[in-house]
Structures are given as structure tokens and as C-alpha cells.
Amino acid sequence: MLLKQTKIVASISDRRCDVDFIKQLFEAGMNVVRMNTAHASREGFEALIANVRAVSNRIAILMDTKGPEVRTTANAEPIPYKTGDKVKIVGNPDLETTRECIAVSYPNFVSDLNIGGMILIDDGDLELEVIDKTNDYLLCEVKNDATLGSRKSVNVPGVRINLPSLTEKDRNNILYAIEKDIDFIAHSFVRNRQDVLDIREILDAHNSDIKIIAKIENQEGVDNIDEILEVADGVMVARGDLGIEVPQERIPGIQRVLIRKCILAKKPVIVATQMLHTMINNPRPTRAEVTDIANAIYYRTDALMLSGETAYGKYPVEAVRTMTKIAAQAEKDKLEENDIRIPLGENSNDVTAFLAKQAVKATSKLKIRAIITDSYSGRTARNLAAFRGKYPVLAICYKEKTMRHLALSYGVEAIYMPELANGQEYYFAALRRLLKEGRLQPSDMVGYLSSGKAGTKTSFLEINVVEDALKHAEETVLPNNNRYL
């Protein structure tokens, strides 16, 4: 049973990933576990994946790729800088960073930048201006007091870094994700459709159905969002790097536009970064953080993500529980008239979209308390999620993987039920389950979308009273699937 309709992604470190910890997060409202490939070993991944699967087959796993990012190299100890200091920057991944010379992982870094350009290191904590340039290095002036640690992020607002979309490490991690049957790959710094297709090519070559989430982290990704959505399976609004690459005052507007475009495309969208940042060290959020979460839900996001709050923070379970409470209240408070209106799209023959829209509309006209769909690919459930009904969607899935792929879709409770003969059996099993849990009464009405046959497109919508539907089930001598109650 869903504690709220908005889904929660929680980042988990291999240093804190025991079964009991993951179970606590799951029971607090977590739907998806995020693994960051930049901060874990292969052995750590093995333990994390095994422990997630031990807790529940309903928890989806999302793996981050590094993408075309630039980082400083390692340094022996933290380096303090003062405003006005001068420092050289070179593009040499094999060179250790020192106080006099910061080395970065991108070899062509010097040639890509010009005098007057700004360089932001460690999410903008250290700001540098290029004041001179040679063939070998950039001479920069430090613009603020800061301390530089090892392997920190490097951003250059307004400059296109000509790195390939995938590193060799990314390719190896994608192959590992395929081997371990991971559910989602979140690709960092997606700039255009080709960045997504580069991953799709690898997945297709291995007959993998892993879903690709495009992380929008720079202006180029924002500008190309329409073409990205044509080929990606979902989007993450990664506000950390995005807030460095573009003026931070533009982030709320960009967030709203990206959410709207994802809903119109009927693809899940995640809002990420600093949602409950103060809960890394404090047991309670700020009022601004509470409002930030609520506003993301009012904008109609599918999911919210926690990063450091759950990866290494002092109050990880409390952070998930807090986000769950805020989400549940915001869902009650949001106004239906502010919902993003979803047109059927250019393809007026899209029967699935038409029926999904009618089912959701019916919940506001009739006393429908749930919408049920049997789901082979998850497409019908994602259509229902896009139309944002006020009652939950119960998706009865033919495959475990489909169930987990729906872990990012708003308001969808996905359940795996194998070995049933047809969609009607799934429907009746779902009704009995909801009755037993007290979530439906015999006199309630439900909507049911199905094709009647696994693997074919949704072709009909039924609206029934629960007790009448179950009476029909008994008359047709369909089995009472108590094993799924």
C-alpha cells in the first residue's frame, strides 16, 4: 500500500547498506534506491544490490553514470585559497593537484576556455576567473575564500566541453548493470538525443530493457529537452550542477517547464538535489525545504530524490519519513484546477491514452475509488500516472521488472502476479486483495483498463461495482487466487 502517491528515490552508499537499514527506508516510504558509480567499489555494489533484493522485489534500483563530467585530480590534503590568489589550471588527469597548480581530468580543458571565463569547483564553493592563457595552462584568480578537497566537480558556465557522452568506466558500469538486472540508468549531463542513444545502443546490443533517465544538468540539456524526451524513458531535474551551469534564479522556472514537458510526454520526472539538505546534520528540515518539496508536488513531479541526506547523513530514515509526510499532505492540498492539462497528442488514434484519460476523468464524475490495469510493459500505467488522478492506480504486472519500472510513476502501486491465464484473472485477484486490505468496500466502483491478453495494447475500459464484478467472477468459475491476497 502506498504511503503517498509521489515516489521517493534515496541515494545509498555501500558503506551503509545493510538489510535492516534498507528495510527501514523502504517502510518509511522509499521506492527506488540510487547507486552513485562515482563513490562506490564493485564489491560495494554487489552487497548493496543483494541487500536491496533481500528486502523487497518491489524496490527499484537506479544506477548513476558519470557522463561527460570534469573533476579535479587527487590532492594529498585539503588546499586553502584566499580571495585574490593566483593559481594555474592544467588538463592532465595523471597529475596530482597542488596549491600552485590544479589539475583536471579533461585533457583539452585549456583549449576549450578563454580569458574572462569563469570556473566553478566543488559545486561553486571555489570560484576562479581566467586572467591569462598559454598553450599549456590557464592562469586564474581566486574570487572567494575556500578550501579545495580531492576529485571535486568542475563546471564552466556557458562553455561546451567537448567530451564524449560515455567514458570507458561508464561503459563498464552499464554492462555491469545489465548483468545485475538493474532497473534504471540515470545518465549524467545529457546534452542531446545522441547522448541517450549512445546508451540505448549498448542496451539493445545486449537485449536489455533497462530504462534510461536523462539527467538535465546544463543549458544544452534544457535547450534540447524535446529531442531528449523522444528517446529517454524519463528525466531527472538535477538542480545541483544545473544551478551552477545556469543562473540559480532560473532554476524554479526551468524545473516547472521540465516537469510539464515530461507529463505531456507521459514519462516520469524526478526532482533532485538539496530537498532536505539540512537533515544531513539536523533532525528537522527548514521551512524553506518543506515548501520546496510541496511546490515540486504542486508542479506535478512524479518523484523526489534524496542524496546526501540518506547516503551519509545523520538522519536518513527520518529524512525519508519527513519527505513522505510532506508529500502526503501536499497531495491532499493541491488544487485539481491547477493540474497540467494533458492533450491526447498528435496521434489521435492512441487508444491507450484516450482510455486512460477517460478513466481518470471518471474518478471525478463517478464514485470510483481505484483504477486497476493489468500491465505487460507498464505503458498503460504510465499513461494513467500522467493524467494525475486523485485515486491510486493498481498495476498488476506480468513481470517483476515491469513492477519495478513503475516505481517512479506517480500514484501507481505496482504488484507482480505471475502465472495467471488472462487479464480478467488479474482483475479479480486485485479486487479481492483491495477488499481484504480494507481499501475498497463491496459497494465501491472501480475502473479497469486492459487488453485482455498479455503483450497487446489496452483496448477497453470497464467501470464496475466491486461486488457485481466478483459475482461475475464466481459465475464464470474463475479461480479464487488466494495466493495473491
Cite the ranges covered by each PLM segment.
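Non-catalytic helical/linker scaffolds that mediate oligomerization, partner binding
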Residues: 1-485
